[in-house]
Each structure stands twice: as structure tokens, then as C-alpha cells.
Amino acid sequence: TETQEVDFVINWLNKSYKDMLDETYVNLIPTAHGGSHLNGFKSGLLEAMKEFCEIRSILPKGLKINAEDVIANATFVISSKLQNPQFAGQTKERLDSKDHMAFVSSATKDILSIWLNTHTEEGEKIAELAISAAQSRAKASSTVQRKKTFKGPALPGKLSDCNSAVSYTHLTLPTKDGG
């Protein structure tokens, strides 16, 4: 059987920063584009957080959180160890071992579920961060954008949509001579 291991550290901050630490490694090889272990990690985090929120009835009705909401304010490092890792491409920037994804997801969910349920106060704060991120995402996606009624080439300058910051109306009134 193939030996698999995963170690991770995660830290949630009160707000998100531009350069959040998120690093992934396989057998100490940096995987800049993540891959199976990162996807499994996110999946496990999401499952554990959904379960925690469901047990405590924290999640507002109709709001759905996703993995990106859970890690929005988090910094993390994931280190996986595999006997025969499969990488996508020769540069080893992305792990492509499907079996390892399920392993990491299960391990992450189990560990985080136990931690959240033994540290409920901190767990609720983390859940609030995820809920806040989900609400921000939902609000941004529901922002009404102007529907394009005309499909085709872009309009010339005179006919293009006006800039709401500098908009005006120009009226031309006819004169006596019909002009």
C-alpha cells in the first residue's frame, strides 16, 4: 500500500491582506500551483465548517458558504508526503494524485471538526469570518449590472454609454428658420 501523510498549519486573521501566506509542498518540493493536496485541504475545511455551522445553527438561511469563504482570511502551509507523487507537467508545480485528494480531505475534516468542537468560541469566530466573506461575495454577485441590449461591435464614441460621474444632457432647440 502507498504511504500518505499530510501536515498543515492554518491561521485565521481578522481581515484579509494582499500577500497572505499560502504555500503547498509535496515531499518538500514546493507546488506553486497547488493541486490535489490543496483541493483536498479546501474540501475538508469546507465540510468541517459546514458541519460546525449546521450543528450550531449559525449559518443565515439561504446563505451558502464555499471553500474560498472559509479560507478568505486564512494563512496556511500544507506539506504532503507520498511514495509515488504524480505531478502535472515536468516542473512539479501542481500535484495530480487523485487518491491523495480524498486522503487530505478526510484528514483535514476530521482534525478540524475535532478542533472546532473543542474550541467552540474560536470556532464561532472563524465561522463568522466565513459567513462575512460569503455575504460579501453574495452581495457583490447580486449587484445589478446594466444589461447589454445591443450585441455586436462596440458603439462609436458619440453613441457610447455616458459616464455617470460626468453626465449631461444636450438639447438642441429648433430656431425660426427650421434649423
Identify the role of each PLM range.
Residues 170-179:
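Single conserved hydrophobic/aromatic residue that forms the stacking wall/gate
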Residues 1-171:
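GHKL-family ATPase ATP-binding module
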